[in-house]
Amino acid sequence: MSIKWEKKDGTNEGKLTFEIAPEKIKEGLNSAFNRVKKSLNVPGFRKGKVPRQIFNKMYGEEALYQEALNDLLPEAYSNAVKEADINPVDQPQIDVESMESDAAWVLTAKVTVEPEVELGQYKDLEVTKHPTRVLKADIENELNRLQQQEAELVLKEDEPAEQGDTVVIDFEGKIDGEAFDGGKGENHSLELGSGQFIPGFEDQLVGHKAGEEVAVTVTFPEDYQAKDLAGKEAVFDTKIHEVKTKELPELDDEFAKDVDEDVATLEELKAKIKDRLKDQKVAEAKAAIQEEALDIAVENATIGEIPAVMIEDDVHRQMDNFLAGMQNQGISADMYYQLTGTSADDLHKQFEEGAEKRVKTNLVLEAIVKAEKIEPSEDEINAEIKSLAEQYQMDEAAVRSALSDDMLKHDIAVRKVVDEIADSAKQTRDAKKDEE
């Protein structure tokens, strides 16, 4: 097939000229005729049994051209794109240049393609050093968290509430003396200092005892999710039923066994915590180095103007993934917007912020994959399928049928590039030394 790609200078647009060969046209016309004749009623012939020559005489072979083109175009365009070695980012605008019975059909496609990427340095980059040592303070903080988790709430008799205490309250909010939707609650447990309520609400309960009634005056934040309440002052009539304080367990062997049945002593628990924190710090350091190295690689690259459609596609992809995650938690898109007081436009704006960076990063990664000629092996593809099957609890055959080899190869190749960029990076900034 003869193809020609002409890119407009200074733009991401161009014209792709390509052909459909006569033998392919013949196959397409035969297929189109076999479909069309099934619905034809021609005098002297049973429905669907009209001969081809009679059809051509009555309607002309040209009557089959559009039907045949609809069949042939997807493959012809796809092959032309591959041969031209371009990466379209939007649906093409197809025009027919010539359609003759005994010659190749000639078509043109107005195509928007990915911007050109000129790679800069992406190996041996200098990045910040991320310490992975586990310090005594880290272990103590985790033990304190476990203590808080295992703490018991004990009633405070005739004692005022303090930060960190839990109060059980009834409340009803009013604006200008009028109650509003969502402003009332009964027997609600609230930890003071948790930030669960509007700023200022919890602070005004500190110093009060069980049985007392408190008028809590607050102002809703300007960016409050319920737009009709944003920026308004409200008074909450609040009745305190109970004040409870946390009673922390002793840090001893019994505590250790309570929080982890696989250990027998506090020292064993500390050792296990240290190992877990070490793994966590190593993983966090790896992620931070990857992110920093990628950012530098993108900065070092020269990237053409990003087509608007690429930004929009990324935003919609992020939105779809986010809402799918919500749906998996039983929250529909409409329910999410209602609960958060937002809209699809708000979510769109939220994901617009990082869209250009994400698109540029993907372009650079794909350029490196191409430059390094990275081609995942069959073993790597099989391992990826097995991993995905385990992750989503699916049959491996189902995963393979759901994902194309090209998609799997792309994901594996990009991941390998990210690892290679990070692994080659030099951690030049010394971390602050702390005692273990």
From Swiss-Prot:
It comes from the Bacteria. Pfam families: FKBP_C, Trigger_C, Trigger_N. It is an enzyme of class 5 (isomerase). Residues 164-249 form the PPIase FKBP-type domain. Its EC number is 5.2.1.8. GO terms for molecular function: peptidyl-prolyl cis-trans isomerase activity; protein folding chaperone; ribosome binding. Transmembrane segments: none annotated. Gene3D superfamilies: 3.10.50.40, Trigger factor ribosome-binding domain (3.30.70.1050), Trigger factor, C-terminal domain (1.10.3120.10). GO terms for cellular component: cytoplasm. GO terms for biological process: 'de novo' cotranslational protein folding; cell division; chaperone-mediated protein folding; protein transport; protein unfolding. The keyword Cell cycle applies. Consists of 3 domains; the N-terminus binds the ribosome, the middle domain has PPIase activity, while the C-terminus has intrinsic chaperone activity on its own. Involved in protein export. Acts as a chaperone by maintaining the newly synthesized protein in an open conformation. Functions as a peptidyl-prolyl cis-trans isomerase. Belongs to the FKBP-type PPIase family. Tig subfamily. This is Trigger factor. It comes from Ligilactobacillus salivarius (strain UCC118). The gene is tig.
